[in-house]
Amino acid sequence: MNQVYNFSAGPAMLPAEVLRRAEQELCNWHGLGTSVMEISHRSKEFIAVAAEAEKDLRDLLAIPENYNVLFCHGGARGQFSALPQNLLGDKSTADYIVSGYWSECAAKEAEKYCTPNIIDIRSNTDGITSVKPMNEWALSSDAAYVHYCPNETIEGTAIFEEPDFGDDKIVIADYSSTILSAPIDVSRYGVIYAGAQKNIGPAGITVVIIREDLLGKAHKHIPSILDYTVQVKADSMYNTPPTFAWYLSGMVFKWLKEQGGLQEISKRNLAKAELLYRAIDNSNLYINRVALQNRSIMNVPFQLVNPALDGKFLEEAYAHGLHALKGHKVAGGARASIYNAMSYEGVKALVEFMADFERRNG
């Protein structure tokens, strides 16, 4: 079978080594004669899996001891609802930084529970998209927290600054598409959350990292499954968790440590992104419409100067083993998502195909 590279924005490709190991263990996990999918989440064997996954994640991100790590259901959209219900307390507003589609979705969901102060930081100059730096964010004095998304997958925009708004600001960040791609100073945040299906593991599990002092503030009518305090007390097993996704996520954490940790992964990711952006910028057929300082390392959207070639480009790319390059319906064009599991060789194969396609169609 020819090599296939999956550029999907999510669910995204998983490390080949992880998939091979999962295949080997699928029907007889640890000599039990059964799959890890079939054992009780309360068995000593699975509790060990869960504990090791948390330990490895803590090691990778250097998570301080005063933070709890949860493995939840519901994806990032579930957290859009959980956050205000857990953290508003007696306040009626929160700052929502809107930099793209997903942060706007979070703000819209928050409207069910409060009157969010929406701060739109998007800018467009001559067709080039950028986002305002943090020192230009007009934060309110009475907000329960500040919510933002460091990486917008659809627009391909990124915020590389880490927050420094003072100790009185509780910062919440949706790291779904960029977690584990580079080191993070977790201590700058009150809550970090991330859907698994991009850089953590398969769809079905969501990581929530929450500072201990933020627990115990949930609204009295919050569904128990969304209550962080309930989940902490239950070790993320208030109900049956997505055990296979948890197991595979733990294997990805182990793989990341084996690669040299997040410093090494960050170097690889930068090299992949630089290769692809250089190919786009040096071409006459492809264009990326994001300002240099805000270009995402994880998600690279690009358009063909002649949109009539979009279908042909995507069809031929697929035939060459370059899959899932179609841009989001909101943005159109093409998009290459180059998360941790995407190899440099995969990006090189895409760049070589793009050059060949331009020679034949430019």
Swiss-Prot record:
Cofactor dependency: pyridoxal 5'-phosphate
Catalytic reaction annotation: O-phospho-L-serine + 2-oxoglutarate = 3-phosphooxypyruvate + L-glutamate; 4-(phosphooxy)-L-threonine + 2-oxoglutarate = (R)-3-hydroxy-2-oxo-4-phosphooxybutanoate + L-glutamate
Any GO CC annotation of this UniProt entry: cytoplasm
UniProt-listed PROSITE patterns: AA_TRANSFER_CLASS_5
Pathway participation: Amino-acid biosynthesis; L-serine biosynthesis; L-serine from 3-phospho-D-glycerate: step 2/3; Cofactor biosynthesis; pyridoxine 5'-phosphate biosynthesis; pyridoxine 5'-phosphate from D-erythrose 4-phosphate: step 3/5
Cofactor note: Binds 1 pyridoxal phosphate per subunit.
Pfam families: Aminotran_5
Record's function text: Catalyzes the reversible conversion of 3-phosphohydroxypyruvate to phosphoserine and of 3-hydroxy-2-oxo-4-phosphonooxybutanoate to phosphohydroxythreonine.
Protein name: Phosphoserine aminotransferase
Lineage of the organism: Bacteria, Pseudomonadati, Pseudomonadota, Gammaproteobacteria, Enterobacterales
Gene: serC
